[in-house]
Each structure stands twice: as structure tokens, then as C-alpha cells.
Amino acid sequence: MKIIEKKYIKDNENVQGYYSGKYLLYQLGISKVKPKTIEIYSNNETQRSKVVNICGKRLLLHKPRTKIDKFNASVLCFLELMNGIDTETLDEYKRKLISDYIAENRITQRQITKYIPFFPDKTCRNLIESEVIYRVPQ
């Protein structure tokens, strides 16, 4: 995993990507099932998406919606989470896990407002329907 981290997520202090999809759900504890494929958005990917195998791990790599850096990676990751989440399955426990991520990464409404135009309308709809937006500080 260190090779994957260094190549696609973070090389020293240079943040260039983040985990997404079912793997992110697993990392946050929202899903108990460890997926076979690790989904990553990375500046080091130029194609819209492609599958590669590294160190016996299957990766689904995506070109980012906008350039990723240490200042925006956590909010982009959060918005990607909200884009793909099934709001019907969100219970209070899962909302709490998402709230914890928001707090740990100090995500603000101002950051969300800045980056949400890069995401589909579904992302904004999911933020509201899940009521997660009300847990984000101004």
C-alpha cells in the first residue's frame, strides 16, 4: 500500500489524490465489507478512469474533477463521498461517522461552496437529503 500511497495519494508533503467509492466507505466505517477494488482520484491520472494492478491490488484510478492539493483534498474527498452515497441507507450512526470526518478535516460550508460546482447536481441533492450539510460548520 505504501507504493500506492506514494504514487497516487501523497508523496512526502505533496498531496495529489484521495480514496473514493466503496473503499472510502470502508475506511470511514460506513461499510463493513472491504472492496476488492480501491478507487482513487489522483492528479497523476490523465484518463477519465482506468483499472490497473499494483502490488496485487486492483485500482480504479480517476482523473480528478479539479487539481488536488493539501488544501482541498479532504473537501473533494467528502464531496465525492456525498456524490456516491445512497442516502436511503444512511442511519444516525453513519451520519455520525460522516460528521466525524467533517470535524477531523475541518471542512467548512465555504469550502463546499467553492468546490461543489465541479460535481454533479446529485452531490448537492445528497448533501441536503442526507441532512449532512446541516452538520458542516460555516
Predicted regions and their residues:
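Short gly/ser-rich loop at a beta-strand->alpha-helix junction or flexible surface loop bordering the NTP-binding
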Residues: E13-I54
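Alpha-helix C-capping/helix-to-loop hinge sites
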Residues: D11-N12, I85
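Short beta-edge/loop segments at beta->alpha junctions of small alpha/beta modules
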Residues: M1-K10
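Sequence-level detector for tyrosine residue identity
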Residues: Y8, Y18-Y19, Y23-Y26, Y41, ...
